[in-house]
């Protein structure tokens, strides 16, 4: 959220109106934002490297190796590795996997697969987090549409981010676009603050109504990463992954 003036006055008014106002620990300084931005550049460079090399016939473990090697080559550390026991340096989620898939030598990409590669980087102490969908070769029109609409949902969310509006405004833009295209948004998993830690407050939902949730203020840094489902929003945790 870009800088602006009049923070104190707006805070007082919003608190009086009963809205959720972010604490000072959520708001980053300009120096911290610059550090997060530099981390984000490394993160995107790693995703670009994956984009140049991903193809049918490789394992998701190969993607993990690319991410780990490239991140370290650029001076970063893969944030997922060892985080709450996660055993790999990247999350790879194929087709009906919603998120947080664990790379494996046994999982081989096939023509027509769609895969989300979720890269997170620590660079000079700052965290960044971004994912990208890839279509392996040619796929079905239904899968192509799902990937396209998911990207559009992110773009609609970004357009709705403005100082002194609400996270619910962003969520409404994301959810509305998904529904207009016949899709649903996962409720139980959302975005999060990021920058000084991997996962920070606030929790970022993509299904809450306009005018609700936390006030967006200058200096906040958070992810917009809706999980868009073809079908219902229901999910379950795979015991093997």
Task: Put a short name on every predicted segment.
Residues 93-126, 201-241:
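Acidic/histidine-enriched ion/cofactor-binding microenvironments in catalytic or ligand-binding pockets
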């Amino acid at each position: 959220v870009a800088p602006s003036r009049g923070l104190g006055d707006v805070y007082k008014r919003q608190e009086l109106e009963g809205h959720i106002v972010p604490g000072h620990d959520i708001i980053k300084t300009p120096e911290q934002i610059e550090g997060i931005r530099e981390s984000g550049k490394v993160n995107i460079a790693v995703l670009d490297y994956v984009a140049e090399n991903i193809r049918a016939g490789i394992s998701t473990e190969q993607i993990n190796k690319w991410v780990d090697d490239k991140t370290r080559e650029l001076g970063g550390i893969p944030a997922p590795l060892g985080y709450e026991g996660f055993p790999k340096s990247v999350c790879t989620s194929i087709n009906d996997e919603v998120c947080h898939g664990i790379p494996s030598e046994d999982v081989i990409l096939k023509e027509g697969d769609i895969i989300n590669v979720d890269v997170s980087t620590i660079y000079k102490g700052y965290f960044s987090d971004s994912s990208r969908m890839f279509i392996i070769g040619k796929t079905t029109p239904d899968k192509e549409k799902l990937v396209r609409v998911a990207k559009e949902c992110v773009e609609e969310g970004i357009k709705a981010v403005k100082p002194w509006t609400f996270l619910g405004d962003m969520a409404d833009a994301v959810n509305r676009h998904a529904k207009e295209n016949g899709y649903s948004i996962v409720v139980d998993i959302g975005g999060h603050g990021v920058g000084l830690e991997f996962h920070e407050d606030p929790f970022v939902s993509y299904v809450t109504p306009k005018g609700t949730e936390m006030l967006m203020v200058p200096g906040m840094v958070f992810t917009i990463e809706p999980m868009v489902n073809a079908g219902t929003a229901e999910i379950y945790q795979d015991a093997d992954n």
